Regions:
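Transmembrane alpha-helical insertion/packing segments
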Residues: 3-69, 222, 231
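Hydrophobic alpha-helical transmembrane segments
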Residues: 139-164
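Interfacial segments of alpha-helical transmembrane regions
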Residues: 90-109, 177-192
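Alpha-helical transmembrane segments of multi-pass integral membrane proteins
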Residues: 32, 37, 189-255
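Hydrophobic cores of alpha-helical transmembrane segments in multi-pass inner/ER membrane proteins
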Residues: 71-84, 158-170, 225-243
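Membrane-interfacial, low-structure loops and terminal tails that flank and connect transmembrane helices
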Residues: 2-28, 91-92, 174-187, 245-255
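Juxtamembrane "helix-exit" motif on the non-cytosolic side of transmembrane helices
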Residues: 47-58, 173-176, 203-215
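Transmembrane alpha-helix/helix-exit interface in multi-pass inner-membrane proteins
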Residues: 109-129
């Protein structure tokens, strides 16, 4: 009996054997998956140390600072990718794949909307008095009201990034099946390790900052958010590429 030819990890394919994706980013693409995390660290630390007044005046301000604009643009790009996936027949035929794309789209929409207070930072409308009573920054957003709208989803995201962005990629060389089983489509690639590592390191810096220790960067929580949002965007980029690879394989003649 001729052994079955390994196919790509497709949640719709209940039986293996499976083979790893070949579209995941490698070293030729390090300019973005490694370059951006390094750029964020160099910019945050360098500007805080060399030009603290400039960093405070132009990078950190709510609504129009460089970092705030980046925090709006990154999830907006993620929203475009995730929303496009929702209309693909391949995705709609796979409930789990559709669910992940939908969660990605909703998450990116929420983040982008919240970062700009759903347009308040663009159009400068006044916050209704009843909403100002519950919003600690007098803005028309949810994340400055109750913990369930900010701390809870952020904690879940941080845990997910630690496990998916560090634990799984570092374990994969010792457990190759992680890249070649039915659900491998959903696991972050090794290319996301630098972003996850940046989020963890600046989280430690933020804890020191909260403890009253002098740190290398002002408001490290803003840098953490940059890493968190970029992780989502990078994950969606790879997720879309893997789906494209699956689509191509599905349309290829079987040998």
């Amino acid at each position: 009996m001729t052994p079955m030819r390994p196919h790509l990890p497709d949640p719709k394919q209940a039986e293996g054997p499976y083979r790893p994706f070949t579209s995941d980013p490698g070293w030729p693409e390090a300019w973005w998956w490694l370059g951006f995390p390094l750029l964020v660290a160099v910019f945050s630390i360098g500007a805080s140390q060399i030009a603290p007044d400039w960093y405070r005046s132009y990078a950190l301000p709510e609504g129009y600072g460089i970092i705030e604009v980046v925090h709006f643009v990154i999830p907006l790009l993620g929203l475009l990718i995730a929303a496009r996936l929702l209309f693909l027949p391949f995705v709609r035929a796979r409930p789990m794949v559709f669910a992940v794309a939908a969660i990605g789209a909703v998450s990116c929409l929420y983040i982008a909307g919240e970062e700009m207070s759903w347009g308040q930072h663009f159009f400068h409308w006044n916050t209704p008095e009843y909403w100002a009573l519950v919003n600690r920054q007098d803005e028309t957003n949810l994340h400055n009201t109750y913990a369930i709208f900010e701390k809870t989803p952020r904690s879940l995201l941080e845990i997910g990034i630690f496990i998916g962005g560090l634990v799984i990629p570092l374990a994969a060389p010792f457990a190759p099946w992680l890249r070649a089983f039915r659900m491998s489509l959903f696991l972050p690639p090794a290319a996301l390790v630098p972003t996850a590592l940046g989020a963890v390191l600046f989280k430690l810096i933020d804890r020191l900052h909260q403890g009253g220790y002098s740190t290398l960067v002002m408001r490290p929580s803003e840098t953490i958010e940059t890493y968190l949002y970029f992780f989502i965007l990078a994950y969606l980029i790879v997720f879309a590429r893997r789906i494209k690879e699956l689509e191509a394989a599905e349309g290829a003649p079987q040998k």
